[in-house]
Curated annotation (Swiss-Prot):
Residues 38-181 are annotated as: Disordered. GO terms for cellular component: adherens junction; cell surface; extracellular region; focal adhesion; plasma membrane. It comes from the Eukaryota. It is found in: Cell membrane; Cell junction; Secreted. This is CD99 antigen-like protein 2. The chain crosses the membrane at residues 186-206. InterPro entries: CD99L2 (IPR022078). It comes from Homo sapiens. Residues 1-25 form the signal peptide.
């Protein structure tokens, strides 16, 4: 209760102070209304405002519609109106329909190659390149290769280009030793394979002989060891036999002496 009373007294004192300040008419204090009201009724030279309206070049705005006209979606596109729309029936306006036809662009074909030394795949589809009765028909240009040449190659013959044609480039048929290029490589591969097989056979034979020799030495040592043990056993047993025979002989009483004969 004490807190509520103190708060109420503070609010009351603040309200009284505000009323006293307004009644005193002190214009020197800070007031937000001073920023809104004009402090002087005399306008200064710089208070004049100049308004400039700039119209879009080449564009005329359509006249305003009379009141009572219906809703027209064309009003949203007034900026694109050039002022040439005709009034429609019932106060409404219609758009002028414009039909635009777009033609397909004409493509220009590249001119045919007039050089006779260049290779052209289109020559294979030209019937004029085929031979007729052993004679070649005149060609428009390109190469001198035709279906007849393919038939000659498949039939076991060799390709013979036309004389006087071609750019004189180097071919594989010009070098008689071109077919021998692959033979040295093949011979080298076969020779290396045979050498590796021979080396493997020799090494395996040597290892087999070494193992055989080692086993033979081991068997000889075992035989000598067995023989040595047998000899030692014989030597150890013979003295015992002799000793036993001597011992038996000494155990017998000596025979009585024979009487002397006269």
């Amino acid at each position: 209760m004490v807190a509520w009373r103190s708060a109420f007294l503070v609010c009351l004192a603040f309200s009284l102070a505000t009323l006293v300040q307004r009644g005193s008419g002190d214009f020197d204090d800070f007031n937000l209304e001073d920023a809104v009201k004009e402090t002087s009724s005399v306008k200064q030279p710089w208070d004049h405002t100049t308004t400039t309206t700039t119209n879009r070049p080449g564009t005329t705005r359509a006249p305003a519609k009379p009141p009572g006209s219906g809703l027209d979606l064309a009003d949203a596109l007034d900026d694109q109106d050039d002022g040439r729309r005709k009034p429609g029936i019932g106060g409404r306006e219609r758009w002028n329909h414009v039909t635009t036809t777009t033609k397909r662009p004409v493509t220009t074909r590249a001119p045919a190659n007039t050089l006779g030394n260049d290779f052209d795949l289109a020559d294979a589809l030209d019937d004029r390149n085929d031979r007729d009765d052993g004679r070649r028909k005149p060609i428009a240009g390109g190469g001198g290769f035709s279906d007849k040449d393919l038939e000659d190659i498949v039939g076991g013959g060799e390709y013979k280009p036309d004389k006087g044609k071609g750019d004189g480039r180097y071919g594989s048929n010009d070098d008689p030793g071109s077919g021998m290029v692959a033979e040295p490589g093949t011979i080298a591969g076969v020779a290396s394979a045979l050498a590796m097989a021979l080396i493997g056979a020799v090494s395996s034979y040597i290892s087999y002989q070494q193992k055989k020799f080692c086993f033979s030495i081991q068997q000889g040592l075992n035989a000598d060891y067995v023989k040595g043990e047998n000899l030692e056993a014989v030597v150890c047993e013979e003295p015992q036999v002799k000793y036993s025979t001597l011992h038996t002989q000494s155990a017998e009483p000596p025979p009585p002496p024979e009487p002397a004969r006269i």
